[in-house]
Amino acid sequence: MSGERAKRFPLALEDLKREPRKPEGRVAERQAAGDAARQRLTAAAAAPAAASPIVPERRAPHGGVFAAKPARAKQHAPAAPGAAKRAPQGGAKQGDRSAAPNVALSGALALTSERVRERMVERLRANGVADPRVLAAMSAVPRHMFVDPGLAAQAYEDAALPIGHQQTISKPSVVARMIELAAAGRALERVLEIGTGCGYQAAVLSRVARDVYSIERVKPLYERAKLNLRPLRVPNIRLHYGDGRVGLPAAAPFDAIVIAAAGLDVPRALLEQLAIGGRLVAPVGEQAGEQVLTLVERVAPAQWRESRLDRVFFVPLKSGVI
């Protein structure tokens, strides 16, 4: 029997006065970790408020101490000074909102802001559009609501955009120019539009004229225009599905007619539906394939005056319906 075991049975008084055992093994490691954790806590108290929060240390069994671990911070939302304050009920935390902005939402808000449309209007004014009613109408109508979502970011650029069925929405500068020519500073009572398309130009016209009649020959575009205009609750637009070259004799005469497609000439039926003193604006194609924005004024029951203005490019004016 070893000397150690010999000391245990029986136990003498001096054997009972043993020194406390020194921490060994994992208990020592725990105590060392606890000391390190306390040092980190002390350092964190002196660090700026932006440091990661520390999880308080927990006592382990048998007197040991578990090491305190830094709380894992969200990668997309680093803490900022004052971020520990609770955000208002129902809202996002300020740190989350600033560190990880929703790009798509920001883009949508930018598109719908008045500032974006105002920049477009400033470009129109710089390009010569002067009628305040036309500029106000262009500023008020949200063009991005009339194009495909994938093209919404380009809605306020001065560009024609596809709307399907081999048709396009005209450039803002062309829309403003045609409406300004048709109005000529007058108070418009009744206006006819040939080629509704997606409904954007009709929406702008509705803010310049008392009543707007618009004809579309492509049935899916006619339905789309109705859907696009519905959220705007425009009460003075009357959409018609039919042949634009025929016009709307039942609603004539019109103070102004705006044709959003190019033919080799202006249909006679539309000239007849123009009121005396009325103005018709249309792109007219030439044999060489070029198109010219043309203004026609009815000066007498059987007399019209024609003026050729700007070079333009429009989809062709066709007969019938599809």
From Swiss-Prot:
Keyword DNA damage among UniProt keywords: no
Protein name per the record: Protein-L-isoaspartate O-methyltransferase
Keywords for this protein: Cytoplasm, Methyltransferase, S-adenosyl-L-methionine, Transferase
Composition bias type Low complexity, residue spans: 33-51, 76-91
Xref: NCBIfam families: pimt, PRK00312.1
GO cellular component: cytoplasm
Recorded GO MF terms: protein-L-isoaspartate (D-aspartate) O-methyltransferase activity
GO annotation (BP), single: methylation
Gene: pcm
